[in-house]
Amino acid sequence: MYVVESKAGAIGCMILSLCCLGSWPAILTLLERRGRLPQHTFLDFATANLLAAIVIAFSLGEIGKSTFLKPDFTTQLPQDNWPSVLLAVAGGVLLSIGNLATQYAFAFVGLSVTEVITASITVVIGTTLNYFLDNKINKAEILFPGVGCFLIAVFLGAAVHASNAADVKEKLKSLPSEDLYSSIENGEDKPEIEKTDVESQEKLAEKAKAGTAGFYVELENKRAIKVFGKSIMIGLFITLFAGISLSLFSPAFNLATNDQWSTLPKGVPKLVVYTAFFYFSIAGFLISLILNLIFLYRPMVGLARSSLKKYIYDSKGRGWAVFAGFLCGFGNGLQFMGGQAAGYAAADSVQALPLVSTFWGIVLFGEYRKSSKRTYALLVSMLAMFVAAVAILMASSGHRK
């Protein structure tokens, strides 16, 4: 199997992983904003995620010479390593539930802020756990200041969200139609605007430039998850739940591949990254399949009811959802490969993915467009702190013996 031997190789894996894991949320957000049901999107996403793990296992997991301590993927499959397999399965379930929750949080809280909050929880809980599980192979004097920088960036991100929310509220007050603004406040549908008055809808679309009040109204009319009039606590609760789930999957994977609790029978080698990732991804796919099949018929947060037949025939946006799944799958694989070499605490530097997600949020969705100078100043400060956090966490990486 292919093994990352050098610190430089591990850091390279982390950088590539950061780009992949920071980009797929933008694709899911794009599809939801275009009106595709999140249940349909996540089924495609989860399938591609599993395929990525299979490709990695049967390619990188089979390269090179197989040894007793580092067997290749197919050699290890029949071995008696179920305690570690169950830990990998637990990690896959946690990641999948966390990703599923973030998909809904993106609509309520926004792409950038959702990623900031979930990443902060992951850094505080997950990175600290990984540091001790890895027998402190990372440099604490560098690692924890990096965590501190990340937390500062989190508070800056919260300030960005508050400032931008105030900007948006002020823009919506400028709408010329009091009735239209009332519908936004109460979350009510206006059939005369959305369905019958095509001319008014076209005029609104013509004026809807990113960052304007018309832009937010048009977005609400198109998107799958309606958010106007909904309590912000719904989104924050979903985001908090997602963050806790995501903070625990990496320590579970760490335990699966390094057996710190000595659960394996004597003489059985530890799970290699590729075998653990294979079981990890199968578990994630199965829990995603079960939950989203339920959500097709019993949808959450006021979504339209669907069916398996409707999902099969809903090909619009499927290619993008599959692409997002591959990005997530390969991103996770690269994170684990880098973590095996440099320590999972350092590999958790990929949780600075809000840096990438914020970039896509600005470029693709016009987030913070036409905002106040205060919002821009806070945004630049947050991004600068994220850059510092990534650099410091990567510099803390040690080398597993």
UniProtKB/Swiss-Prot annotation:
The keyword ATP-binding applies. InterPro entries: UPS_plant, Ureide_permease. The chain crosses the membrane at residues 11-31, 41-61, 82-102, 105-125, 142-162, 232-252, 276-296, 319-339, 345-365, 375-395. One of its GO terms (cellular component) is membrane. The keyword Transcription does not apply. ATP binds at residues 224-231. Residues 1-10, 62-81, 126-141, 253-275, 340-344, 396-401 are extracellular. Keywords: ATP-binding, Membrane, Nucleotide-binding, Transmembrane, Transmembrane helix, Transport. It is a multi-pass membrane protein. It is found in: Membrane. Residues 32-40, 103-104, 163-231, 297-318, 366-374 are cytoplasmic. Expressed in developing seedlings, flower filaments and stigma, and the top and bottom parts of carpels in siliques. One of its GO terms (molecular function) is ATP binding. Proton-coupled transporter that transports a wide spectrum of oxo derivatives of heterocyclic nitrogen compounds. Belongs to the plant ureide permease (TC 2.A.7.19) family. This is Ureide permease 4. It comes from Arabidopsis thaliana. The lineage of its organism: Eukaryota, Viridiplantae, Streptophyta, Embryophyta, Tracheophyta.
